[in-house]
Amino acid sequence: MCSWVWAWQHWEWWAVVVEPLPCWLMNTTASSATPSGIPPQALAGLKVIELGQLIAGPFAGKTLADFGAEVIKVEPPAVEGGAGGDPLRQWRMLHNGTSVWWQVQSRNKQSVVLDLRTDEGRDTVRRLIDEADVLIENFKPGTLEKWGMGYEVLSRSNPGLIMLRVSGYGQTGPYRDRPGFAVVAEAMGGMRYLNGEPGRAPVRAGVSLGDTLAALHGVIGVLLALQARQASISRDAPKGLGQVVDVALYESVFNCMESLLPEYSAFGAVRQPAGSALPGIAPSNAYPCVDGMVVIGGNGDSIFKRLMIAIGRDDLATDPQLTRNPGRVARVAEIDAAIGLWTQARRVEQVLAVLNAASVPVGRIYTAADIAADPHFQAREMILPVTTPDGLTVQVPGIVPKLSRTPGAITRRAPDLGEDTEAVLSRLQP
Protein backbone atom coordinates (compact mmCIF):
# COMPACT_ATOMS: atom_id res chain seq x y z
CA MET A 1 0.00 0.00 0.00
CA CYS A 2 1.01 3.63 -0.32
CA SER A 3 -0.31 7.02 0.42
CA TRP A 4 -2.38 8.39 -2.37
CA VAL A 5 -5.98 7.68 -1.53
CA TRP A 6 -7.48 7.27 1.91
CA ALA A 7 -10.90 7.93 3.32
CA TRP A 8 -10.82 9.44 6.77
CA GLN A 9 -13.58 7.52 8.51
CA HIS A 10 -16.99 9.13 8.20
CA TRP A 11 -15.59 12.16 6.36
CA GLU A 12 -17.30 13.17 3.15
CA TRP A 13 -14.14 13.66 1.14
CA TRP A 14 -11.19 11.65 -0.02
CA ALA A 15 -7.74 12.60 1.09
CA VAL A 16 -5.28 12.28 -1.73
CA VAL A 17 -1.96 11.64 -0.37
CA VAL A 18 -1.58 12.50 -1.19
CA GLU A 19 20.53 31.25 6.61
CA PRO A 20 16.71 31.86 7.35
CA LEU A 21 15.12 34.40 5.03
CA PRO A 22 14.01 37.60 6.78
CA CYS A 23 10.66 37.29 5.03
CA TRP A 24 9.93 34.10 6.92
CA LEU A 25 10.39 35.82 10.24
CA MET A 26 8.21 38.73 9.16
CA ASN A 27 5.46 36.35 8.14
CA THR A 28 5.15 34.31 11.33
CA THR A 29 4.34 34.95 14.95
CA ALA A 30 5.92 31.69 16.12
CA SER A 31 9.11 31.76 18.13
CA SER A 32 12.19 30.88 16.11
CA ALA A 33 14.17 29.94 19.20
CA THR A 34 16.30 26.82 18.89
CA PRO A 35 16.31 24.26 21.73
CA SER A 36 19.27 24.57 24.06
CA GLY A 37 22.39 22.90 22.72
CA ILE A 38 21.14 22.77 19.12
CA PRO A 39 22.99 24.99 16.59
CA PRO A 40 20.90 27.53 14.65
CA GLN A 41 18.76 25.73 12.09
CA ALA A 42 18.34 26.69 8.45
CA LEU A 43 14.52 26.94 8.53
CA ALA A 44 14.07 28.40 12.00
CA GLY A 45 11.16 30.86 11.95
CA LEU A 46 9.36 29.13 9.09
CA LYS A 47 5.80 28.16 10.02
CA VAL A 48 4.16 25.25 8.18
CA ILE A 49 0.63 23.88 8.39
CA GLU A 50 0.47 20.25 7.31
CA LEU A 51 -2.88 18.88 6.20
CA GLY A 52 -1.33 15.83 4.57
CA GLN A 53 -1.62 12.16 5.45
CA LEU A 54 0.45 9.01 5.16
CA ILE A 55 3.66 9.40 3.13
CA ALA A 56 4.07 12.11 0.49
CA GLY A 57 2.76 15.23 2.23
CA PRO A 58 4.02 14.26 5.69
CA PHE A 59 7.48 13.36 4.35
CA ALA A 60 7.73 16.87 2.93
CA GLY A 61 6.65 18.27 6.29
CA LYS A 62 9.15 16.07 8.11
CA THR A 63 11.99 17.28 5.93
CA LEU A 64 11.17 20.92 6.64
CA ALA A 65 10.76 20.17 10.36
CA ASP A 66 14.13 18.42 10.51
CA PHE A 67 15.76 21.74 9.65
CA GLY A 68 13.92 23.87 12.16
CA ALA A 69 10.56 24.74 10.60
CA GLU A 70 7.63 24.80 13.01
CA VAL A 71 5.34 22.17 11.49
CA ILE A 72 1.80 21.97 12.84
CA LYS A 73 0.14 18.77 11.71
CA VAL A 74 -3.66 18.98 11.60
CA GLU A 75 -5.34 15.61 12.21
CA PRO A 76 -8.97 14.47 12.36
CA PRO A 77 -10.48 13.55 15.73
CA ALA A 78 -11.23 10.00 16.75
CA VAL A 79 -14.69 8.85 15.72
CA GLU A 80 -16.79 5.90 16.77
CA GLY A 81 -15.13 2.74 15.55
CA GLY A 82 -11.92 4.49 14.50
CA ALA A 83 -8.64 5.57 16.05
CA GLY A 84 -8.54 9.07 14.57
CA GLY A 85 -5.52 10.94 13.35
CA ASP A 86 -3.32 10.24 10.37
CA PRO A 87 -3.94 6.63 9.24
CA LEU A 88 -0.18 6.08 9.19
CA ARG A 89 -0.40 5.86 12.98
CA GLN A 90 -1.89 2.39 12.35
CA TRP A 91 0.34 1.20 9.50
CA ARG A 92 2.73 -1.75 9.59
CA MET A 93 4.18 -2.90 12.93
CA LEU A 94 2.58 -1.34 16.01
CA HIS A 95 3.80 -0.76 19.56
CA ASN A 96 1.00 -0.14 22.03
CA GLY A 97 -1.35 0.65 19.17
CA THR A 98 0.90 3.08 17.27
CA SER A 99 3.19 2.41 14.33
CA VAL A 100 6.89 2.73 15.09
CA TRP A 101 7.11 4.30 11.61
CA TRP A 102 5.18 7.22 13.12
CA GLN A 103 8.33 8.18 15.03
CA VAL A 104 10.05 8.79 11.69
CA GLN A 105 7.32 10.46 9.69
CA SER A 106 6.09 12.86 12.39
CA ARG A 107 9.18 13.69 14.41
CA ASN A 108 9.73 17.37 15.18
CA LYS A 109 6.03 18.12 14.51
CA GLN A 110 3.13 19.30 16.65
CA SER A 111 -0.26 17.58 16.47
CA VAL A 112 -3.48 19.59 16.48
CA VAL A 113 -6.87 17.90 16.24
CA LEU A 114 -9.51 19.75 14.22
CA ASP A 115 -12.73 18.42 12.77
CA LEU A 116 -12.73 19.74 9.22
CA ARG A 117 -16.26 18.42 8.76
CA THR A 118 -17.43 21.40 10.79
CA ASP A 119 -17.51 25.13 10.11
CA GLU A 120 -15.67 25.69 13.40
CA GLY A 121 -12.86 23.34 12.41
CA ARG A 122 -12.44 24.92 8.99
CA ASP A 123 -12.53 28.41 10.48
CA THR A 124 -9.79 27.49 12.95
CA VAL A 125 -7.55 25.96 10.31
CA ARG A 126 -7.98 29.08 8.16
CA ARG A 127 -6.77 31.16 11.10
CA LEU A 128 -3.75 28.91 11.43
CA ILE A 129 -3.05 29.27 7.71
CA ASP A 130 -3.33 33.06 7.95
CA GLU A 131 -0.28 33.03 10.24
CA ALA A 132 1.69 30.46 8.23
CA ASP A 133 4.38 30.64 5.59
CA VAL A 134 3.62 27.27 4.00
CA LEU A 135 0.55 25.06 3.67
CA ILE A 136 1.05 21.41 2.72
CA GLU A 137 -2.05 19.64 1.41
CA ASN A 138 -2.56 16.39 -0.44
CA PHE A 139 -6.29 16.14 -0.83
CA LYS A 140 -8.01 15.27 -4.04
CA PRO A 141 -7.79 18.33 -6.34
CA GLY A 142 -10.75 20.61 -5.70
CA THR A 143 -11.30 19.59 -2.07
CA LEU A 144 -9.96 22.82 -0.58
CA GLU A 145 -11.90 24.84 -3.14
CA LYS A 146 -15.07 23.02 -2.11
CA TRP A 147 -14.40 24.13 1.46
CA GLY A 148 -13.85 27.71 0.38
CA MET A 149 -10.11 27.36 1.04
CA GLY A 150 -8.60 27.52 -2.43
CA TYR A 151 -5.38 29.44 -2.94
CA GLU A 152 -7.13 32.51 -4.33
CA VAL A 153 -9.18 32.75 -1.13
CA LEU A 154 -6.37 32.00 1.32
CA SER A 155 -3.90 34.35 -0.36
CA ARG A 156 -6.24 37.33 0.07
CA SER A 157 -5.58 37.34 3.80
CA ASN A 158 -2.06 35.90 3.51
CA PRO A 159 -0.51 36.99 0.19
CA GLY A 160 2.85 35.50 1.13
CA LEU A 161 1.41 32.01 1.57
CA ILE A 162 3.12 29.17 -0.29
CA MET A 163 0.81 26.22 -0.88
CA LEU A 164 2.38 22.84 -1.63
CA ARG A 165 -0.24 20.70 -3.38
CA VAL A 166 0.70 17.05 -3.81
CA SER A 167 -1.60 14.77 -5.81
CA GLY A 168 -1.42 11.73 -8.03
CA TYR A 169 -1.72 13.54 -11.36
CA GLY A 170 -1.46 17.25 -10.58
CA GLN A 171 -3.98 20.07 -10.30
CA THR A 172 -4.61 20.28 -14.07
CA GLY A 173 -4.98 17.90 -17.00
CA PRO A 174 -7.49 15.22 -17.95
CA TYR A 175 -6.46 12.87 -15.11
CA ARG A 176 -6.55 15.42 -12.27
CA ASP A 177 -9.66 13.91 -10.66
CA ARG A 178 -8.43 10.33 -10.67
CA PRO A 179 -7.41 8.74 -7.37
CA GLY A 180 -3.73 7.94 -7.42
CA PHE A 181 -1.67 5.49 -5.39
CA ALA A 182 2.12 5.60 -5.55
CA VAL A 183 2.16 2.16 -7.13
CA VAL A 184 -0.02 3.41 -10.00
CA ALA A 185 2.04 6.55 -10.49
CA GLU A 186 5.28 4.55 -10.47
CA ALA A 187 3.80 2.48 -13.29
CA MET A 188 2.64 5.53 -15.25
CA GLY A 189 5.95 7.31 -14.73
CA GLY A 190 7.86 4.46 -16.38
CA MET A 191 9.58 2.96 -13.35
CA ARG A 192 7.52 -0.18 -12.86
CA TYR A 193 8.00 -1.44 -16.43
CA LEU A 194 11.77 -1.47 -16.02
CA ASN A 195 11.83 -3.34 -12.70
CA GLY A 196 12.15 -7.10 -12.75
CA GLU A 197 13.49 -9.83 -14.97
CA PRO A 198 12.98 -9.88 -18.76
CA GLY A 199 9.86 -11.79 -19.74
CA ARG A 200 8.36 -11.78 -16.24
CA ALA A 201 5.80 -9.56 -14.54
CA PRO A 202 7.20 -6.18 -13.46
CA VAL A 203 7.97 -5.89 -9.76
CA ARG A 204 7.85 -2.89 -7.48
CA ALA A 205 10.42 -1.60 -5.04
CA GLY A 206 9.78 -2.63 -1.45
CA VAL A 207 9.03 0.95 -0.40
CA SER A 208 6.86 3.71 -1.84
CA LEU A 209 9.53 5.50 -3.84
CA GLY A 210 6.94 7.51 -5.75
CA ASP A 211 5.65 9.10 -2.57
CA THR A 212 9.11 10.03 -1.34
CA LEU A 213 10.18 11.41 -4.72
CA ALA A 214 7.05 13.58 -4.79
CA ALA A 215 7.79 14.81 -1.27
CA LEU A 216 11.36 15.77 -2.15
CA HIS A 217 10.25 17.56 -5.31
CA GLY A 218 7.71 19.35 -3.13
CA VAL A 219 10.38 20.49 -0.68
CA ILE A 220 12.48 21.79 -3.56
CA GLY A 221 9.45 23.69 -4.81
CA VAL A 222 8.78 25.21 -1.40
CA LEU A 223 12.37 26.41 -1.05
CA LEU A 224 12.29 27.89 -4.56
CA ALA A 225 9.03 29.66 -3.76
CA LEU A 226 10.49 31.03 -0.53
CA GLN A 227 13.42 32.46 -2.46
CA ALA A 228 11.05 33.99 -5.02
CA ARG A 229 8.91 35.42 -2.21
CA GLN A 230 11.91 37.11 -0.69
CA ALA A 231 12.81 38.61 -4.07
CA SER A 232 9.26 39.94 -4.55
CA ILE A 233 9.20 42.13 -1.45
CA SER A 234 8.05 45.61 -2.38
CA ARG A 235 6.06 48.54 -1.03
CA ASP A 236 2.88 46.86 -2.27
CA ALA A 237 3.94 43.43 -0.98
CA PRO A 238 5.96 44.06 2.19
CA LYS A 239 6.12 40.36 3.02
CA GLY A 240 6.55 39.18 -0.54
CA LEU A 241 4.25 37.12 -2.71
CA GLY A 242 3.61 33.42 -2.34
CA GLN A 243 2.50 30.93 -4.96
CA VAL A 244 1.25 27.39 -5.53
CA VAL A 245 3.71 24.50 -5.80
CA ASP A 246 1.94 21.81 -7.84
CA VAL A 247 3.57 18.37 -7.53
CA ALA A 248 2.23 15.28 -9.29
CA LEU A 249 3.47 11.97 -8.07
CA TYR A 250 3.78 10.40 -11.54
CA GLU A 251 5.80 13.42 -12.75
CA SER A 252 8.19 13.09 -9.82
CA VAL A 253 8.84 9.50 -10.88
CA PHE A 254 9.10 10.38 -14.57
CA ASN A 255 11.61 13.13 -13.78
CA CYS A 256 14.02 10.45 -12.55
CA MET A 257 13.79 8.14 -15.55
CA GLU A 258 17.10 9.24 -17.07
CA SER A 259 17.41 8.40 -20.79
CA LEU A 260 14.07 6.59 -21.11
CA LEU A 261 12.26 9.19 -23.24
CA PRO A 262 15.19 10.66 -25.23
CA GLU A 263 16.17 7.19 -26.44
CA TYR A 264 12.61 6.47 -27.53
CA SER A 265 12.30 9.86 -29.19
CA ALA A 266 15.59 9.63 -31.07
CA PHE A 267 15.76 5.93 -31.91
CA GLY A 268 12.32 4.43 -31.25
CA ALA A 269 13.98 2.29 -28.58
CA VAL A 270 11.69 1.08 -25.78
CA ARG A 271 13.92 0.31 -22.83
CA GLN A 272 13.29 -3.14 -21.38
CA PRO A 273 13.70 -4.62 -17.89
CA ALA A 274 17.16 -6.00 -17.23
CA GLY A 275 16.97 -7.62 -13.81
CA SER A 276 19.77 -6.52 -11.50
CA ALA A 277 21.90 -5.04 -14.28
CA LEU A 278 21.98 -1.45 -15.50
CA PRO A 279 21.22 -1.70 -19.23
CA GLY A 280 23.56 0.10 -21.59
CA ILE A 281 26.25 0.53 -18.93
CA ALA A 282 28.72 -2.26 -18.17
CA PRO A 283 29.65 -3.84 -15.93
CA SER A 284 27.16 -2.94 -13.21
CA ASN A 285 25.34 -5.82 -11.56
CA ALA A 286 24.79 -7.96 -8.48
CA TYR A 287 27.08 -10.95 -8.08
CA PRO A 288 26.91 -14.03 -5.81
CA CYS A 289 29.43 -14.76 -3.09
CA VAL A 290 29.79 -17.78 -0.81
CA ASP A 291 27.81 -16.09 1.96
CA GLY A 292 25.75 -13.40 0.26
CA MET A 293 25.61 -10.98 -2.64
CA VAL A 294 27.55 -7.88 -3.62
CA VAL A 295 26.89 -5.08 -6.07
CA ILE A 296 29.81 -3.99 -8.23
CA GLY A 297 29.93 -0.86 -10.36
CA GLY A 298 32.85 -1.28 -12.72
CA ASN A 299 31.43 0.80 -15.54
CA GLY A 300 34.01 3.59 -15.64
CA ASP A 301 36.79 3.05 -18.17
CA SER A 302 39.66 3.19 -15.68
CA ILE A 303 37.59 1.45 -12.99
CA PHE A 304 36.91 -1.46 -15.35
CA LYS A 305 40.61 -1.94 -15.94
CA ARG A 306 41.33 -1.97 -12.19
CA LEU A 307 38.46 -4.41 -11.63
CA MET A 308 39.73 -6.87 -14.21
CA ILE A 309 43.25 -6.74 -12.81
CA ALA A 310 41.90 -7.27 -9.28
CA ILE A 311 40.05 -10.44 -10.30
CA GLY A 312 43.01 -11.78 -12.25
CA ARG A 313 41.68 -11.10 -15.74
CA ASP A 314 44.47 -9.02 -17.19
CA ASP A 315 43.44 -10.25 -20.63
CA LEU A 316 40.13 -8.39 -20.33
CA ALA A 317 41.80 -5.38 -18.74
CA THR A 318 44.00 -4.93 -21.80
CA ASP A 319 41.48 -5.98 -24.46
CA PRO A 320 41.16 -2.95 -26.81
CA GLN A 321 37.50 -3.77 -27.49
CA LEU A 322 36.68 -3.23 -23.82
CA THR A 323 38.38 0.10 -23.19
CA ARG A 324 35.13 2.04 -23.75
CA ASN A 325 31.58 1.43 -22.58
CA PRO A 326 30.02 0.52 -25.99
CA GLY A 327 32.45 -2.36 -26.40
CA ARG A 328 31.79 -3.59 -22.87
CA VAL A 329 28.03 -3.43 -23.40
CA ALA A 330 28.40 -5.64 -26.49
CA ARG A 331 30.22 -8.25 -24.39
CA VAL A 332 28.48 -7.74 -21.06
CA ALA A 333 27.50 -11.40 -20.66
CA GLU A 334 31.15 -12.45 -20.94
CA ILE A 335 32.25 -9.77 -18.47
CA ASP A 336 29.52 -10.59 -15.94
CA ALA A 337 30.40 -14.28 -16.14
CA ALA A 338 34.05 -13.52 -15.41
CA ILE A 339 33.19 -11.37 -12.41
CA GLY A 340 30.64 -13.88 -11.09
CA LEU A 341 33.10 -16.75 -11.39
CA TRP A 342 35.52 -14.81 -9.20
CA THR A 343 33.03 -13.61 -6.58
CA GLN A 344 31.25 -16.94 -6.09
CA ALA A 345 34.48 -18.51 -4.86
CA ARG A 346 34.91 -15.91 -2.12
CA ARG A 347 33.16 -14.59 0.94
CA VAL A 348 31.63 -11.13 0.89
CA GLU A 349 34.30 -9.65 3.15
CA GLN A 350 37.06 -10.99 0.90
CA VAL A 351 35.46 -9.43 -2.17
CA LEU A 352 35.01 -6.11 -0.38
CA ALA A 353 38.62 -6.07 0.82
CA VAL A 354 40.11 -6.79 -2.61
CA LEU A 355 37.92 -4.40 -4.59
CA ASN A 356 38.06 -1.56 -2.08
CA ALA A 357 41.85 -1.82 -2.18
CA ALA A 358 41.62 -1.52 -5.96
CA SER A 359 39.30 1.53 -5.72
CA VAL A 360 36.43 -0.31 -7.39
CA PRO A 361 32.91 0.65 -6.19
CA VAL A 362 31.52 -2.41 -4.37
CA GLY A 363 29.07 -3.01 -1.59
CA ARG A 364 27.22 -5.66 0.34
CA ILE A 365 23.46 -5.82 -0.22
CA TYR A 366 22.27 -4.73 3.21
CA THR A 367 19.37 -5.91 5.30
CA ALA A 368 17.98 -3.84 8.17
CA ALA A 369 20.25 -5.82 10.51
CA ASP A 370 23.30 -4.95 8.41
CA ILE A 371 22.37 -1.26 8.48
CA ALA A 372 21.88 -1.22 12.24
CA ALA A 373 25.30 -2.79 12.81
CA ASP A 374 27.32 -0.78 10.29
CA PRO A 375 29.87 1.62 11.84
CA HIS A 376 29.67 4.07 8.93
CA PHE A 377 25.95 4.66 9.55
CA GLN A 378 26.82 5.30 13.20
CA ALA A 379 29.72 7.62 12.42
CA ARG A 380 27.51 9.70 10.11
CA GLU A 381 24.74 9.85 12.72
CA MET A 382 22.36 8.13 10.33
CA ILE A 383 20.93 5.94 13.10
CA LEU A 384 19.46 7.97 15.94
CA PRO A 385 17.46 6.91 19.01
CA VAL A 386 13.99 8.25 19.79
CA THR A 387 12.10 7.38 22.97
CA THR A 388 8.33 6.99 22.84
CA PRO A 389 6.11 8.30 25.68
CA ASP A 390 5.97 4.81 27.23
CA GLY A 391 9.75 4.42 27.24
CA LEU A 392 10.45 2.36 24.10
CA THR A 393 13.66 3.39 22.35
CA VAL A 394 13.30 3.23 18.57
CA GLN A 395 16.14 3.67 16.10
CA VAL A 396 15.21 5.99 13.24
CA PRO A 397 17.04 7.33 10.17
CA GLY A 398 19.12 10.43 10.82
CA ILE A 399 19.05 13.81 9.08
CA VAL A 400 19.75 14.24 5.35
CA PRO A 401 21.47 16.33 4.04
CA LYS A 402 24.26 17.28 6.42
CA LEU A 403 24.70 21.06 6.74
CA SER A 404 27.95 22.28 8.27
CA ARG A 405 26.75 25.52 9.90
CA THR A 406 22.99 25.09 10.32
CA PRO A 407 22.47 21.33 10.64
CA GLY A 408 19.15 19.62 11.08
CA ALA A 409 18.26 17.80 14.28
CA ILE A 410 15.62 15.68 15.96
CA THR A 411 14.40 18.01 18.68
CA ARG A 412 11.26 16.15 19.74
CA ARG A 413 9.60 12.77 19.32
CA ALA A 414 6.50 12.31 17.20
CA PRO A 415 3.42 13.67 19.00
CA ASP A 416 0.47 11.81 20.42
CA LEU A 417 -2.82 12.61 18.72
CA GLY A 418 -3.82 16.16 19.62
CA GLU A 419 -0.92 16.56 22.04
CA ASP A 420 -0.35 20.20 21.06
CA THR A 421 -3.90 21.34 20.32
CA GLU A 422 -4.34 23.54 23.37
CA ALA A 423 -0.88 25.11 23.18
CA VAL A 424 -1.08 25.89 19.46
CA LEU A 425 -4.61 27.28 19.50
CA SER A 426 -3.88 29.42 22.54
CA ARG A 427 -1.25 31.27 20.50
CA LEU A 428 -3.64 32.13 17.66
CA GLN A 429 -4.21 35.81 17.09
CA PRO A 430 -7.77 36.81 18.11
Would you name each region that the model predicts?
Residues 215-241, 255-266, 308-314:
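Oxidoreductase and adenylate-handling cofactor-binding alpha/beta cores
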